[in-house]
C-alpha cells in the first residue's frame, strides 16, 4: 500500500513547526540573558575582613562628551579635560573596606587619612605613631586610610595586592576603583562622606588629613573634649580672600570653564582639619547637590557655604609648616610642636623622630637645648 505523497508546502509547514517546538524547549530551560554592569577586575576579597554588607557594582560611568564642543576645551591640559569629561561621576565600586569592628563601638575621633596606593611607607609609619588606634584619656581613636587605584593597570595590580595584604592585617583600608590623582581628591572626600553615613555614624569627630602630616592626636582629644559633636565645628588653617589660579602650568590651575567666579569661599587647607559629626552630615547634604570641584579643600568650603556654615581657624594647625623665630633655631625643635595640633608636611623618618621626642617624659622646653 502506498502512502499518500505530501506536497512541498506540507513538508515546509512540518519543518517550521518542528523548529518552533525546539526553540520553545530551549528557551524554557534557560533564563533570558541580560547585560551585566562592568565591574572591577579585582578578585573577590577575603570575607574574613569585609563588612558583610551586600555590595552592588555600579555600571561604569561614561564620559560627558558634550563638554568637548566648548571652544576652549581643546586647549586645556589633559587632566583638566579628563576632569570635565567625568565630573558627573560619583558612584564607584568599593574594592576594600575596614573590618566590621572599626566602628562597632562609639568612636571619639576617627582619623580619615587620604593616602595614595604607593604610600605604603607613610601608612606604616602612621600606624606606629600618631595614628595608632588607642584610647587617649578614655577617648577611643580609630584609623582609616582613604585610597583609590593607580592609573597604570600593571602598577594597579601590584598596589592593589599590597593594599589587600594591608587590609587583611590591619583592617584600616577603604579603597575605591577610581584613579587616585590630585584632581580626584574631591571624589575621595565625597565617597568617604557617603561611606561614613552607612558604616561609621557613631564617630563624634573626624580628623581629615593627608598621610604626610604630623598630628598631635593627644592634643586634639584635649581640644575636642570641650566641644559638642552635635554642634558645628570645622577648624584648621583658614584661607580666605583668594581665588582660582589661571596659570595653566600650575598644579592648582582652574580655567573659567570649570569655575567662572574669581573668588573662592573661605576654606581650610586640605593638609588637615577637624570637624564634628554635625558638620560631616552638613557637608554630605551639600556635596549631593553641588557640582564637583577638583580642589578638595575648596570644594568643602563651597559645601560649608551652601549650608550657611563657616570654617574656623585654629592656631595649632600649621599646614604651611613651622617657622622658628630665628634662623639659628631649628624648625624641627620638638618644643615648637608640643602644643600644636597638626603640622604639614613630614617625611616618614621625621614623623618617628618627632613622635618619639614628644613622648619623652624628660622633654624640657625653654632655655634648655633642643632635642634636635
Swiss-Prot record:
It is a single-pass type II membrane protein. Residues 1-10 are cytoplasmic. Keywords: Glycoprotein, Glycosyltransferase, Golgi apparatus, Membrane, Signal-anchor, Transferase, Transmembrane, Transmembrane helix. The chain crosses the membrane at residues 11-31. It catalyses: a 3-O-{beta-D-galactosyl-(1->3)-[N-acetyl-beta-D-glucosaminyl-(1->6)]-N-acetyl-alpha-D-galactosaminyl}-L-threonyl-[protein] + UDP-N-acetyl-alpha-D-glucosamine = 3-O-{beta-D-GlcNAc-(1->3)-beta-D-Gal-(1->3)-[beta-D-GlcNAc-(1->6)]-alpha-D-GalNAc}-L-threonyl-[protein] + UDP + H(+); 3-O-{beta-D-galactosyl-(1->3)-[N-acetyl-beta-D-glucosaminyl-(1->6)]-N-acetyl-alpha-D-galactosaminyl}-L-seryl-[protein] + UDP-N-acetyl-alpha-D-glucosamine = 3-O-{beta-D-GlcNAc-(1->3)-beta-D-Gal-(1->3)-[beta-D-GlcNAc-(1->6)]-alpha-D-GalNAc}-L-seryl-[protein] + UDP + H(+); a beta-D-galactosyl-(1->4)-N-acetyl-beta-D-glucosaminyl derivative + UDP-N-acetyl-alpha-D-glucosamine = an N-acetyl-beta-D-glucosaminyl-(1->3)-beta-D-galactosyl-(1->4)-N-acetyl-beta-D-glucosaminyl derivative + UDP + H(+). It holds the Pfam family Galactosyl_T. It is found in: Golgi apparatus membrane. One of its GO terms (biological process) is protein glycosylation. Coiled coil: none annotated. Pathway: Protein modification; protein glycosylation. Residues 32-372 are lumenal. Residues 31-56 are annotated as: Disordered. GO terms for molecular function: beta-1,3-galactosyl-O-glycosyl-glycoprotein beta-1,3-N-acetylglucosaminyltransferase activity; N-acetyllactosaminide beta-1,3-N-acetylglucosaminyltransferase activity. Glycans are attached at residues 64, 184, 202. Its EC number is 2.4.1.149, 2.4.1.146. InterPro entries: Glyco_trans_31. Beta-1,3-N-acetylglucosaminyltransferase involved in the synthesis of poly-N-acetyllactosamine. Has activity for type 2 oligosaccharides. Also acts as a core1-1,3-N-acetylglucosaminyltransferase (Core1-beta3GlcNAcT) to form the 6-sulfo sialyl Lewis x on extended core1 O-glycans. Belongs to the glycosyltransferase 31 family. This is N-acetyllactosaminide beta-1,3-N-acetylglucosaminyltransferase 3.
